[in-house]
Amino acid sequence: MRHPIDPKVDCVFKALLGAESNRDLLIHFLNAVLGADLTRPIVAVEIQNPYNEKEFLDDKLTVVDVKARDATGQMFQVEVQLLNHRDLPARILYGWANLYRSQIKEGESYRKLRPTYAIWLLGQTLLPDAPEYAHEFRLRDQHGRVFLDHGGIWLLELSKFAADAVETEQQRWLKFFNEAERLDEDALPGWMQTPEMRRAMNTLKAFSEKEHAYYAYQARQDFLREQQSIQLEFEDLRAEVEQARAAADEARAAQEQERAAKEQARAAEERERVAKEEALAENERLKRLLADKSESSGTGTP
């Protein structure tokens, strides 16, 4: 290829799995990711929002996920997200719920609802406390019982995937997304020697060889880099704000400790003053007693 192409850039991703000419690749990808959870393999899909090269070249490509329906009515959403943000989990859940809801109109029976699957490829780690790269979320109770087997959300964290050997088709796809940009099409490794991977490389080659497509790809990549820079600046600013807030909290805590210490000191001084007054009063009382005894002794009958 004339230029390296990253399949994770959203426009390439959309062409790879969302173009009508690559429908077989989408089917293969869906079976690779969901195969173990499907009652039967997917054999055909209808892409609901197919990739439109003209929209991409005119910089009007705004919907970059892939939505599809199979022959049984099951719904699928596939999306790549290179940058994390605070609201990403809510966006993922909303996207799944919105696609699930879109199956019926007002007044239609709930029986028309079919399982809906959302697959997200993530460029950055979203779940740092979990060592696994693949996560499956379904509607289950605390004992693991499924409330309704109507699909779910699959997250694939590419930053955690580091398998050297390919053992499953899912791993083959993830390795492709992670490494395809650095591969030499004239010396592809063994794990790339499948019809699906060669077709996927042909899609990347089309972006590399067509000058107008490559310039548009570069513009999209530059936009994503700018977004990443803005995100990093925002995170730095947020970290500074958090540090300032923590410093202010520490200062307030120190002031509170100082105030409490002063209160304790004043209380101690007050106790000491009261003790002194009580001691003086007791001393005066004893003096008076002695004086009274002395007077009684002096005036008494011999």
Enumerate the predicted regions with their spans.
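Short, charged alpha-helical interaction segments and adjacent helix-coil junctions
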Residues: 76-81, 175-302
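Conserved single-residue anchors adjacent to enzymatic active/cofactor-binding motifs
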Residues: 1-209
